[in-house]
Amino acid sequence: MANFHNRDPLSPAFWDERFEKQFTPWDQGGVPARLRRFVADSPAPLRCLIPGCGSAYELVFMLDHGWDAMAIDFSPAAVAAARAVVGARAGQVVEADFFAWQPAAPLDLIYERAFLCAMPRAMWPQVAARWAQLLAPGAMLVGYFFFDDNAKGPPFGISREQLQALLAPHFDCLADEAVDDSIAVFAGKERWMRWRRRAD
């Protein structure tokens, strides 16, 4: 394993160092099957945000299907990796702080993949509150949620009770499905979930 100087996942330098040393065990190297089906089955293109986008393979897939999708990350090295993957549409990848970024138009969907579990547990209420701020009633929070009780991270796993407590004040869970194509770090511990923003 590579030696790292930065141990604070709330610092962009933490993620820069891992991308620069090519230590990215959370990177699937492609688009997960359940997301492929979700995008293909969507009756119309959606306006979507991918926070903490990493290499942003999903962004390419969404754009290819006509979605108005944007990916953000606060790590310059992650943004560079994502722009290399996205190519000619690199303008859809923005270096930004999720907690400060503002959409140009209302979002239909936020895609969750290894963003919540990248955050220390003390930050989770702020993440959930920001999701709720960015999504109007009826809009969706969709993606993969990592369930584990390991004290160390990232990834920081969540319990079902914790996730329910975080999201139930603002969201209704519409889907909760097993995942059969997880990469090693998430294998057997993640679920595909779809949450709908409820009116406050």
What are these language model-derived features?
Residues 1-50, 54-105, 119-200:
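Class I (Rossmann-like) S-adenosyl-L-methionine-dependent methyltransferase catalytic domain
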Residues 108:
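Conserved acidic residues
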Residues 111:
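A conserved beta-strand element that flanks and buttresses the S-adenosyl-L-methionine
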Residues 114-118:
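Short catalytic micro-motifs in class I SAM-dependent methyltransferases
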